[in-house]
């Protein structure tokens, strides 16, 4: 989520390249029948458009899926989210489909394997953060804590429904993201600065930041439990 030159903890980021944190603007892609959508996916990249139309902002309640997204957002620090999106399947293959039981057991041979894998973002610090995060995830589970419940508690279990008319109103963080970031860091998670965390919250539907003019705003709002 963070642009080049930001701090390694991911607390500073450009909102237009910050993971799934996107300052949405309404865009019509040039076709009369095209839906009105946020501008950040552009109008030509099918992968990006599908991510916006099908995934971004949809409430996610599965603990393992949430952990995967948090790990990927950490790997995105310093890069554009589309880079990670294009490598997502390679990441899943490299990290045993983000099975925390397996990732938590990774040793030096696995670290070397991952650092040699050109299909993913190769960073010792980020790889170590993923392995460490898997261990924390399992510790929480073994102590009777559900990861999804832990995260959703920061928004009282319900998505924050924003109604932004334009890009300038969309924030890069929030009090809830600040609190979640602080709690994740206290647990030992890495690459979880408040800007990264807010992007994570947007992407996983804890916050609905599709602009009110985007065709996905209403459907995403209706998905809230």
Locate predicted features.
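Residue-identity detector for glycine
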Residues: 5, 9-10, 19, 30
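HhH-family (HhH-GPD) DNA N-glycosylase catalytic core used in base-excision repair
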Residues: 21-225
């Amino acid at each position: 989520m963070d642009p080049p030159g930001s701090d390694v903890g991911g607390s500073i980021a450009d909102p237009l390249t910050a993971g799934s944190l996107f300052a949405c603007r309404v865009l019509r892609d040039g076709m009369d029948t095209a839906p009105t959508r946020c501008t950040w996916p552009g109008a030509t990249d099918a992968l990006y458009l599908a991510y916006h139309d099908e995934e971004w902002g949809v409430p996610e309640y599965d603990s393992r899926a949430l952990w995967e997204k948090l790990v990927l957002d950490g790997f995105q620090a310093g890069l554009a989210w589309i880079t990670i999106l294009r490598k997502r399947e390679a990441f899943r293959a490299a990290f045993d489909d983000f099975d925390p039981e397996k990732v938590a057991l990774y040793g030096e041979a696995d670290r070397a394997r991952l650092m040699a894998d050109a299909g993913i973002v190769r960073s010792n610090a980020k790889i170590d953060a993923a392995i460490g995060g898997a261990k924390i995830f399992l510790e929480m589970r073994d102590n009777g804590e559900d990861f999804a419940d832990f995260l959703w508690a920061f928004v009282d279990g319900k998505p924050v429904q924003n109604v932004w008319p334009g890009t300038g109103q969309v924030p890069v963080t929030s009090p809830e993201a600040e609190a979640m970031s602080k709690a994740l860091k206290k647990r030992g998670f890495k690459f979880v600065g408040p800007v990264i965390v807010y992007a994570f919250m947007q992407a996983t539907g804890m916050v609905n930041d599709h602009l009110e003019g985007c065709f996905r705003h209403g459907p995403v709002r209706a998905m809230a439990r």
